[in-house]
Amino acid sequence: MSRPQLRRWRLVSSPPSGVPGLALLALLALLALRLAAGTDCPCPEPELCRPIRHHPDFEVFVFDVGQKTWKSYDWSQITTVATFGKYDSELMCYAHSKGARVVLKGDVSLKDIIDPAFRASWIAQKLNLAKTQYMDGINIDIEQEVNCLSPEYDALTALVKETTDSFHREIEGSQVTFDVAWSPKNIDRRCYNYTGIADACDFLFVMSYDEQSQIWSECIAAANAPYNQTLTGYNDYIKMSINPKKLVMGVPWYGYDYTCLNLSEDHVCTIAKVPFRGAPCSDAAGRQVPYKTIMKQINSSISGNLWDKDQRAPYYNYKDPAGHFHQVWYDNPQSISLKATYIQNYRLRGIGMWNANCLDYSGDAVAKQQTEEMWEVLKPKLLQR
């Protein structure tokens, strides 16, 4: 609180003669609100700079990577926006007007956090940033290798606990979350204390995508988030005694485009061997493609839309100008809906996606319908019996 603010407070503390008591109380309340929000609040109304305190029964967790597409999101559903692009005060104000939290991205080198003093400094820096930007918490996104016997194993759990304690203490109603792989079984050599981290934060965002990051079988193109494999990951988290209410299902709004070394008549696409963290093949042989691009390309494909009944995922084949065959795997409302049923059956905390910018918000009639269908599928369904 700056000195001019203090002087201003003292001036109104002595009631001038003739001012009705209720009017004075209202004035004091307004000034207190402005002081609490800060004089540099960028929002049209100062109360929009106050942190969100409400905790929804069902979480819809949105990752936003920048620009202004957020203006076209389905705000009737959104509960949290994790900002992984440049900070946008307009987004913060608008999200708060809709009762949605806006949280920071948290990333740090695991080698550094072994030092408790470094952890304290990092947390203080992030907390100060959240306060000055009127944000509601932090999403910790650390996808680095950790050896089970290394000092980083315990340091990471300590970082999450200390971050949660600090944010909860300093920002009322704040939220601290942690991103985990689709399975707790040391995916990409990430040996984390998943139960300890889940206990230490508000909830885990399970990244149920990039599930071909380590291909141990045939080097062929496959679904980004195969149905059975995805749900097995959640079963494994729950078997570790992690409360389902600590799990948010993350779904992909993008796919993978693979160049086929060979494309068989029964649509098996052999891909180049690109090793990753010990595995002989990986989805690094392909490139990520947003849903909006996929929807534009599918009509000009050589196969049309195809469906894999085992992986319960859509895909298609196309031929590029150089004559090479490609296979594209992705998720659509049908595949997402099948997986989302698990959320209600096992009472997970909610759903989210990477990332909301992947849809077409141009206003084109066909694109608009496709975009609405992707948002619609996030809504909780009736419990399956």
UniProtKB/Swiss-Prot annotation:
SMART domains: Glyco_18 (SM00636)
EC id: 3.2.1.-
Single GO biological process annotation from the record: oligosaccharide catabolic process
GO cellular component term, pick one: lysosome
Residue positions of the active site: E143
Location in the cell: Lysosome
Residues in GH18 domain copies: 39-385
Disulphide bonds in the chain: none
Record PROSITE patterns: GH18_1, GH18_2
Glycosylation-annotated residues: N193, N228, N262, N299
Function: Involved in the degradation of asparagine-linked glycoproteins. Hydrolyze of N-acetyl-beta-D-glucosamine (1-4)N-acetylglucosamine chitobiose core from the reducing end of the bond, it requires prior cleavage by glycosylasparaginase.
Family according to the record: Belongs to the glycosyl hydrolase 18 family.
Protein name from the UniProt record: Di-N-acetylchitobiase
Organism, as annotated: Homo sapiens (Human)
